[in-house]
Amino acid sequence: MNARFLIVPFLAAAVSCAGVHFSESDGLPPIRPDYIGVTIPEGIAPLQMEMADGRECSYTSERIGDTLYFTVSAWQKGSREGIRYAPFPVYVSHDPIDPYLAYRLIEPGYESWREMGLYSRELASYKEKAIVTNSAVGGACVNCHNFPGGDPSRMMFHVRGAGGGTVFAKDGMLRLLNLTTVGPHRQGVYPAWHPSGRYIAFASNSIQQSFPISGTQQVEVYDHWSDIILYDVGTDSVTVYPPLFEASRNETFPTWSPDGSSLFFCCADSVADVAADRVRVRYRLQRIDFRDGSFVGDPHTVWESDSISVSHPRVSGKWLLFTASRYGTFPIWHREADLWLLDLETGEARPAAELNSEESESFHNWSSGGRWLVFSSRRLDGRYTRLFLAHFDGEGHFSKPFLLPQKAMSHNDLRLKSYNVPEFVRSAPGQYDAQVRKLYGR
């Protein structure tokens, strides 16, 4: 990314301020999205912004070394007087970032939806393409997408409902498997593809909902029971390992270590009435060894707290990021849910204050190089999850997060869907609607 590339989109905006006299201000502009002082990857789509108070604005940029300096001028529509604010920096990092994101778009409801789908977004532009939409499966739910190591030549996703199952894509070819017809006859969610590509760990759970009649939380989602199952892609077989299939414990959110030698997951002691005792249910982070296609030994606790429930662990090198909430296993509906960073070498964990807000932070994933993070947050309005990116220095510190760039802020205001389960992908994923229709005989 260079200054010339950035300035071109802004020149047209500057024309509209002709004839306006600007007084200089030492203050920084109240813009949205808040890009002041963020770190962006080289080559990302141009940052577009507007005044948070609705005033007209124009802006220019100048690059000095690896810093972009934006100067914003603002005025009331029809006025001949305006303010030119002090320049603010945007830092450019040369740390590589995977060129695509994959995510699900869905209305933030409880039971119903109209349209949903899995989509990819090119980070160097604003281009978004459908991987598969639920129109290809008669309006059923499509979810739980996963790519092995961000490799778009292989992926999987679930289709819920009558005739549903798990769809596997490999080199552009699709096949359908119903996990409940093999092994222990259990469905699977929250997939985690082993680095070798041979195995997929799933949580197999009974998901329930309750609707509190007091307080501000609209819905509570919880597991009545949950276990870990292992699918062998090579043999189409599903196995269970007794220590991960205990009725006295609920295991969920599997994720592999980078070398595939162990599986991290979240575990809580079972309670008889989860709906009534949900505030007592707190998940701890556990780990179990994995060798030659099998789990080995008993799991051990990596981190736990009597006041925090752990969910969505993701590992990069010696660092593990998880979502922390007061209780439970579905933090997206918990306003207090924050991201925490755990040093696996020291066992010390801290809130990732650089990333967190007053609203819920939940799903997150590392880039393949471990220097970038994508996560979902409801910080803009408390209802819809949007995607934010942040740089990681490799020493335990994140930069200020920034909203995924769009052509205009109105895109975020008018798109009444939530971004769900973001994942970095190393190149453009396929588009499978036509093949999925054929697979389902539509």
Each model region followed by its residue ranges:
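Bacterial N-terminal signal peptides that target proteins for export
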Residues: 1-6
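Sequence signature of WD/YWTD-type beta-propeller architectures
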Residues: 17-442
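Bacterial N-terminal signal peptides
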Residues: 7-16
